[in-house]
């Protein structure tokens, strides 16, 4: 290829390290879609496992991109689209096939609400990326429940169903419909929720933190549904705690900005 001066221009080459985060994002997308495929075949454990693995990969791609200095606009857009499918569309379809299809009315509407609210939450997040004033983010909080966490919370009835040896009460469409709509509302809410990206561990606590991660991994392997149920319940309980913590931050900021 030649420019106007007749000199050859080398085609722009992308370093391999820049492709690694995007490859992880695509893997998360594939796992989310694979969850739908397993749900169609009534393989509920595999469906849940696929979407949970997608959530783990989603938590890795951004950090790996920063570690490799491979952040890009393309990667950010791909991550958002992947999240919408893996944590909005896929959970909605799985819940519909598992329970909501048995509702006499509005079962599909509840599933759509979860998928649409996930898309709206991601759109709001993207629209605020370049915004200068983000009170929640500057204080270390998210606005509303993030998409991966929302998917995990939406699956609480399925976790209970599996833990209780598939008791039909947890699969009943009325329970699942109400819960799905509640989680959909949390995703688009303006409630402050803790952002684990803002967590800083003191140096003297590093070994304890690593031991905790190892124990969590062991629990996830030996009793996955009980562990995921406990984790989702803990996250849900922490929402009012985060609300109280942010209220303290607001009062502190108001006091600092007030007259001396």
Whereabouts are the PLM-identified features?
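Topogenic membrane-insertion module of multi-pass membrane proteins
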Residues: 1-59, 242, 260
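C-terminal ends of transmembrane helices
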Residues: 63-72, 119-137, 188-197, 243-247
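Helix-coil boundary and interhelical linker segments in multi-pass alpha-helical membrane proteins
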Residues: 34-49, 89-112, 156-176, 221-226
């Amino acid at each position: 290829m030649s420019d106007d001066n007749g000199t050859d221009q080398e085609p722009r080459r992308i370093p391999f390290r820049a492709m690694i985060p995007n490859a992880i994002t695509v893997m998360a997308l594939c796992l989310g879609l694979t969850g739908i495929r397993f749900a169609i075949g009534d393989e509920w454990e595999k469906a849940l496992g696929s979407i949970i693995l997608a959530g783990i990969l989603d938590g890795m791609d951004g950090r790996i991109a920063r570690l490799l200095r491979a952040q890009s606009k393309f990667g950010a857009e791909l991550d958002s689209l992947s999240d919408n499918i893996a944590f909005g569309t896929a959970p909605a379809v799985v819940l519909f096939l598992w329970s909501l299809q048995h509702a006499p009315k509005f079962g599909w509407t509840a599933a759509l609400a979860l998928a649409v609210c996930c898309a709206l939450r991601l759109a709001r997040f993207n629209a605020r990326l370049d915004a200068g004033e983000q009170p929640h983010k500057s204080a270390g909080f998210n606005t509303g429940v993030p998409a991966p966490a929302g998917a995990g919370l939406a699956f609480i009835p399925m976790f209970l169903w599996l833990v209780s040896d598939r008791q039909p009460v947890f699969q009943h469409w009325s329970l699942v419909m109400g819960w799905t709509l509640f989680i959909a509302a949390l995703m688009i809410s303006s409630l402050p929720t803790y952002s684990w990206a803002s967590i800083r561990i003191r140096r003297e606590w590093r070994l304890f933190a690593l031991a905790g991660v190892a124990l969590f991994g062991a629990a996830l392997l030996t009793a996955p549904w009980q562990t995921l149920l406990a984790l989702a319940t803990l996250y849900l309980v922490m929402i009012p705690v985060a609300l109280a913590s942010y209220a303290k931050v607001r009062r502190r900021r108001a006091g600092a900005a007030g007259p001396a």
